Swiss-Prot record:
Family: Belongs to the RuBisCO small chain family.
Complexes and interactors: Heterohexadecamer of 8 large and 8 small subunits.
Organism: Flaveria trinervia
InterPro entries per the UniProt record, alphabetical: RuBisCO_ssu (IPR024681), RuBisCO_ssu_dom (IPR000894), RuBisCO_ssu_N (IPR024680), RuBisCO_ssu_sf (IPR036385)
Keyword Chloroplast on entry: yes
Protein name: Ribulose bisphosphate carboxylase small subunit, chloroplastic
UniProt-annotated location(s): Plastid, Chloroplast
UniProt main location, coarse: plastid
Molecular function terms from GO: ribulose-bisphosphate carboxylase activity
């Protein structure tokens, strides 16, 4: 028998993938370079035009909000409403000699400065109205007219003092 050479036809493969040639810059994600200047930062400059703080020279620092002018009765009542809304217990404290920050019982720097203020009555557990706190403030001012008086707010769940601000200062301070 004679052999007949078989002819095999090459079948073209249509599912071949082109070889990986690397990433092409900016092919899929067009990116424009953004200049990060100060003009793109958020600002409240349009709303606050002439904000002036308490002068830093010759003025003693007291507590929270001490850089602002003295609060009015209405502003104090709003601050007390804030601490009542947060379920904090209001309390009044007063100091007759040193209302400003100084070191007496501790020499290390930090939040606590080592001073102790005298508590006016007991903390006002169950207080729900800022008028009650303002009435106690007036009584304390009447009893000690030359005292620094501050209102503090305690969180009795976490057992920490959350807010403290000066409510009254002696004349001349």
């Amino acid at each position: 028998m004679a052999s007949i050479p078989a002819t095999v036809a090459a079948v073209p493969q249509t599912n071949m993938v082109a070889p990986f040639t690397g990433l092409k810059a900016n092919a899929a994600f067009p990116v424009t370079k953004k200049v990060n200047g100060f003009s793109t930062l958020p600002s409240n400059g349009g709303r606050v035009q002439c904000m002036k703080v308490w002068p830093p020279v010759g003025k003693k620092k007291y507590e929270t909000l001490s850089y602002l002018p003295e609060l009015t009765e209405a502003q104090l009542a709003k601050e007390v409403d804030y601490l009542l809304r947060n379920k904090w217990v209001p309390c009044l404290e007063f100091e007759l000699e040193h209302g400003f920050v100084y070191r007496e019982n501790a020499s290390s720097p930090g939040y606590y400065d080592g001073r102790y203020w005298t508590m006016w009555k007991l903390p006002m557990f169950g207080c729900t109205d800022s008028a009650q706190v303002m009435k106690e403030l007036q009584e304390c001012k009447k009893e000690y007219p030359q005292a620094w008086i501050r209102i503090i707010g305690f969180d009795n769940v976490r057992q920490v003092q959350c807010v403290s601000f000066i409510a009254s200062k002696p004349t001349g301070f």
